[in-house]
Regions:
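A charge-rich, low-complexity, intrinsically flexible signal that marks solvent-exposed coils, linkers
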Residues: 1-106
Length: 106
């Protein structure tokens, strides 16, 4: 009986760790994506960091990833950049992998 309870606790701990890691990867991805978009819009320094935080916050609005993609596409188009949702999604996936690698190396 004890071994079953131990296994259950181990499973719950692993699940919690995996969920926290996924959250961190998503947050890192959104920050990197926001900084990429900020650069394309000509933002630098504190303005670029602030935009990165806006993108990060968009994840918590209804729609999640779609909201992030829509925000970046709309903001880039508003600044005169020619970009498609597919291009931004490609960058989103690229930064997800980059964020995951960064976190695994920390």
């Amino acid at each position: 009986m004890t071994s079953f309870a131990d296994r259950e606790k181990e499973f719950e701990a692993r699940f919690k760790h995996d969920q926290e890691f996924r959250f961190k990867v998503t947050s890192r991805r959104n920050r990197l994506l926001g900084l990429w978009a900020a650069e394309k819009m000509g933002l630098t320094g504190a303005d670029a960091e602030a935009y990165g935080k806006e993108v990060l916050a968009a994840q918590f609005e209804p729609g999640g990833d779609k909201r992030v993609l829509d925000k970046i596409v709309n903001d880039l188009v508003a600044k005169g950049q020619k970009v498609t949702p597919a291009q931004v999604r490609f960058e989103l996936e690229h930064f997800a992998e980059q964020g995951k690698r960064q976190l695994m190396n920390e």
